[in-house]
Amino acid sequence: GLLASLGKVLGGYLAEKLKPK
């Protein structure tokens, strides 16, 4: 569903932000 898709996108975004560079 739409919410599931948004959750995946948001989760990926947070993972990238929290990932140490």
Swiss-Prot record:
Regarding tissue, the record states: Expressed by the skin dorsal glands.
The Gene Ontology biological process terms listed for this entry are: defense response; negative regulation of nitric-oxide synthase activity
Q: Where in the cell is it found?
A: Secreted
A GO molecular function term, named singly, is: nitric-oxide synthase regulator activity
Q: Which UniProt keywords apply?
A: Amphibian defense peptide, Secreted
Principal location class:
secreted
Is-annotated flag, keyword Secreted?
A: yes
**Gene Ontology cellular component list:** extracellular region
Function, as annotated, reads: Has no antimicrobial activity. Strongly inhibits the formation of NO by neuronal nitric oxide synthase at micromolar concentrations.
Name of the molecule in the record: Dahlein-5.5
Taxonomic source organism = Ranoidea dahlii (Dahl's aquatic frog)
The top of its lineage is: Eukaryota, Metazoa, Chordata, Craniata, Vertebrata
